[in-house]
From Swiss-Prot:
This protein's UniProt keywords: Cleavage on pair of basic residues, Disulfide bond, Hormone, Pyrrolidone carboxylic acid, Secreted, Signal
Tissues/organs with expression: Expressed exclusively in Leydig cells of the testis.
Subcellular location per the Swiss-Prot or TrEMBL entry: Secreted
Residue ranges crossing the lipid bilayer per the database entry: none
Gene: INSL3
Superkingdom: Eukaryota
Name of this protein: Insulin-like 3
């Protein structure tokens, strides 16, 4: 039995299969991340003090509160409040009446947490939100 045709078929089809399957494996589907799931994914990806490595699978006590302290003053805090996660919601600061409409419109337009919750985010999207 002559194996030359089989060998040539593998030689010719091998690289074609590698090229065809390569980009599909590199692309990742966006994942919808809301509330504390968004924060945890961001911390795992970006890193953070103490609670970023949950190596044994157990969450660190008070982890959500520490996450909020880390995010204080960051552009993501408003996104967490807008996502409506009752565990993470802080009391919003009162705004003057005249600026409430503009603030809401601006927050909706540039709110990464809301975008990740509604449309989903890839790992690369989350990397752009890392502070360092």
């Amino acid at each position: 039995m002559d194996r030359r045709p089989l060998t040539w078929a593998l030689v010719l089809l091998g690289p074609a299969l590698a090229i065809a399957l390569g980009p599909a494996a590199a692309q990742e589907a966006p994942e919808k991340l809301c509330g504390h799931h968004f924060v945890r994914a961001l911390v795992r990806l970006c890193g953070g003090p103490r609670w970023s490595s949950e190596e044994d699978g157990r969450p660190v006590a008070g982890g959500d509160r520490e996450l909020l302290r880390w995010l204080e003053g960051q552009h993501l805090l408003h996104g967490l409040m807008a996502s409506g996660d009752p565990v993470l919601v802080l009391a919003p600061q009162p705004l003057p009446q005249a600026s409430r409409h503009h603030h809401h419109r601006r927050a909706t337009a540039i709110n990464p947490a809301r975008h990740c919750c509604l449309s989903g985010c890839t790992r690369q999207d989350l990397l752009t939100l890392c502070p360092h």
